[in-house]
C-alpha cells in the first residue's frame, strides 16, 4: 500500500498535500541544520510554473547532468512539462538574485512505477543548460553506503515538522544513518520493497513533505560524494522506529533508467 509519499503542495489541481496526511510523502527536513549559501549546489527545487520564492515548491531534485534533473516518480504523476519549472543554484529560494529558473520540455518516469508504485524515480529535461554541478550516482554494485550505520545526508526545502503548511526558504540538511534492509522491518506495513528501496534514519531527524525527490547522498572511501537514494515516503516524519524510505539508486533497473535516459 503506497500512501506515504513526501511531496509538498498541490500541482495543477492534484492535491498531493492532502494525500500526505497521516501516512504520507516526505515533507521538509526535520531537525538538521541550514545549508550555507553555495553548498550542495547540485540541489534542485521543483516548482509550479510561473511561481516565485517558496510559493510553488512541491518537490526536490538533484542535478545529474547539464540537461537532466533526477526526482521522484510520485512527484511527476499526472504532470506535464509545461506545468513545472526547475530552480537550481539557489540555496535560499527567496533570493532570486542568483541561480537559474529553468523550463522543462520532457518528463521521463521509470517504466515500472505505474504498476508497482515502487521504482520511485523520474527525470526532468530542461531547455537551458544547467550551470550548477551534477552529483555523481553511486556506482552500480557499490553497497558500502547501504550498510547498517553508514553515514548519509538528506537535504531539501521540506517542512520542518509533519503537517506544517510552511516551506522554509533556506535549504536544510540532516545527517542520517543507513538502515540495513533486514533491520527496516517496521516499514513492512507501508509496503517496503528491499530490492528497490533503502531506509535511513536518525533520532529526531528526517526528510518530510516537500523533500520528495531530493537526494540521499554520502561519501565513498575515496572521498567522492555520490547519490544513493531518492526521497520517497515515510510514516509521518522522524517517527521513532520507522525510518524514512528512499528509492535505491543502486537498484539495477533504476540505475539503468537514469543512465540510459541521461546518456
Regions found by a protein language model. Name each.
Residues 30-38, 85-132, 143:
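Conserved catalytic-core segment of clan PA serine endopeptidases
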Residues 49-51, 74-78, 89-94, 112, ...:
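Acidic glycine-/aspartate-rich tracts in secreted/extracellular proteins
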Residues 1-28:
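Secretory targeting and sorting signals
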Residues 2-6, 23, 44, 62-76, ...:
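C-terminal subregion of chymotrypsin/trypsin-like serine protease catalytic domains
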Residues 27-51:
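N-terminal activation segment of mature serine protease catalytic domains
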Residues 100-101, 117-203, 251-258:
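Chymotrypsin/trypsin-fold serine protease catalytic domain
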Residues 59-62, 206, 213-215:
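Beta-propeller and closely related beta-sheet repeat lectin domains
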Residues 43, 49-66:
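A conserved glycine-rich beta-strand in the N-terminal activation segment of trypsin-fold
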